[in-house]
Swiss-Prot record:
This is Small ribosomal subunit protein uS10. It comes from Bifidobacterium longum (strain NCC 2705). The keyword Signal does not apply. GO terms for biological process: translation. The lineage of its organism: Bacteria, Bacillati, Actinomycetota, Actinomycetes, Bifidobacteriales. One of its GO terms (molecular function) is structural constituent of ribosome. Part of the 30S ribosomal subunit. Belongs to the universal ribosomal protein uS10 family.
Length: 102
């Protein structure tokens, strides 16, 4: 797979879980003999939701909730077949969204 690059993009609501997952991916790929660039932290996406506390009136009383999406980017330069195989068999937590592009 000479000249190729695999780009892995991780998303999660918990920054500790996404950092552990990125560390696990980097360790398995480097043990398989490929070179890794990253993990690169991407900007955190912050969604704020404004909700009226009362169901009927008192519009001035509101509550704000926020949801943060943490993102990391990992590039694997010149992946070996062993590295690709180890990537396919890695176990990661369910709350981490993974996008892999070749």
């Amino acid at each position: 797979m000479a000249g190729q690059k695999i780009r892995i993009r991780l998303k999660s609501y918990d920054h500790e879980v996404i950092d552990q997952s990125a560390k696990k991916i980097v360790e398995t790929v480097t043990n398989a003999g490929a070179t890794v660039v990253g993990p690169v932290p991407l900007p955190t996406e912050k969604n704020v939701f404004c909700v009226i506390r009362s169901p009927h009136k008192y519009k001035d009383s509101r509550e704000h909730f926020e949801m943060r999406t943490h993102k990391r980017l990992i590039d694997i330069v010149d992946p070996t077949p062993k590295a690709v195989d180890s990537l396919m068999h890695i176990d990661l937590p369910a709350d981490v969204n993974i996008e892999i592009k070749l």
